[in-house]
């Protein structure tokens, strides 16, 4: 018996973009991405126990730092308590280039383990524009029903508009396409998302 491949549906939002504008943000997808994420938490003592209880896949301090330094990167998100950041900073070369370095601005440097782990496991994603002004975002699986995919697309669209730089003029999102992992892209009428 073969297992059917459930393709990820990605949204590609074309934005009117100047390279001087830093286009990035965070959005909570109402129906998640459909992907089971692995979370690594750097914490000690009570916060480590809290992270384990909240559902973190990997929790530790110096032992996990050494494991990552040896090349292990089998996780999707990294969270750290503020007191661990001095040591986690040593992993900047490894985590930074993969976009996994914990940052206070993204909420991944925190003492609220229960809150951040709940967000990460329920469909919170970070997005940023590439050099050409396109934001690429996973919006769910092809097995999702159309209303779930539409809700997720609207959430991303509204988040991008909310994070619009103040000096951006005119229409900010100028096009949207969706494509599955192994499917052609389809243009979406963004007027229906407004």
Per-region residue spans from a language model:
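Translation machinery proteins
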Residues: 1-49
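Flexible, glycine/charged-enriched surface loops at secondary-structure junctions
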Residues: 5-9, 163-175
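Flexible glycine-/small-residue-rich
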Residues: 13, 43, 81-82, 139-141, ...
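Ordered, amphipathic secondary-structure segments that act as subunit-interaction surfaces
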Residues: 39-56, 62-64, 85-87
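Residue-level signature of catalytic and energy-coupling elements of molecular machines
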Residues: 51, 96, 178
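Long, charge-patterned amphipathic alpha-helical coiled-coil/hairpin "stalk" segments used as oligomerization
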Residues: 58-161
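Intrinsically disordered, compositionally biased charged tails
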Residues: 167, 187-194
